């Protein structure tokens, strides 16, 4: 609990309004905007994390749409919080959703409440402390707001300008809008009982009942993510500020040699008096590199995706496996930066085919040739490799995952 320089401390309940559908934020198949990723995490997680680390917050309730329970549960996996976080279902309007959250907090023994839009993730503790100081000093309602700086025009229904509106004493309201708890709960209950459902924010309900609302300075970053472009800009902003998430994966594979007419390594067929034994084409190099790529995002290994017991992969080209792994990496936000393969074999000689192998890796992975390396060494006639009983491969992949913490 944060003791302000005032006569009373603040014990704050937090209501996060997250029941909206976000029709203006793109295709419905993309999901509600509060669950879209920015900087590697859902919008709502960024919002919650700001409140979770604010000392006066003693209870947090997130008001969600009934259809979004699975989405919230998935987002909640990102969260470790000492402050209790609960959910309730919202109503058909923002006003009804807020009331549901307030009713939930009735037995949580909070003195004040901050009501915040889930899709405003860019507030900070300085703003919260400014609000709390005013509440602690006796304000019944506190509204963060910014002076209007754009020129405002009033137009008729046809889009013709009627007049220029003075900006003096005009403010753009933000959230969290904050109140003495019993005051705003009573105001919301009275609004519901009166049949009024047209209030667009909580300060308006306080104004309707004559409750004085104190304005404190908001922040320019505390914007509401409304349309698809807002979400893209927010993602760029956060991703640019994060340290790069560089991951390295390793892979190892070995295949036996048997009598045959050649081996396939990195997709290149090399004539030889032996061949590699395996369920697919036994390209030991690509198998090792496939595992290395999958390792960078914890996606298992090649056997999980292409089990040797599955007859459809009998004799399959290993290009299928490596391109599958590269696709998984990209779907999870990764950019492949480097691929390195070391082959351990007594024969055949790899040197004459190295550039063709590198070219294949470049094509399969969709990266520049200079980012692909193929090396070879013998085992100095030691062990199964030295006895020409098999070929081994060690691979390393470096992947940068964008927008992860």
From Swiss-Prot:
Site (Positions MEP for the nucleophilic attack): 167, 224
Family annotation (Pfam families): IspD, YgbB
Region (2-C-methyl-D-erythritol 4-phosphate cytidylyltransferase): 1-246
Domain of life according to the entry: Bacteria
Named cofactor requirement(s): a divalent metal cation
Annotated residues for binding of a divalent metal cation: 253, 255, 287
Similarity annotation: In the N-terminal section; belongs to the IspD/TarI cytidylyltransferase family. IspD subfamily.
Protein name: Bifunctional enzyme IspD/IspF
Organism: Rhizobium etli (strain CIAT 652)
Species classification: Bacteria, Pseudomonadati, Pseudomonadota, Alphaproteobacteria, Hyphomicrobiales
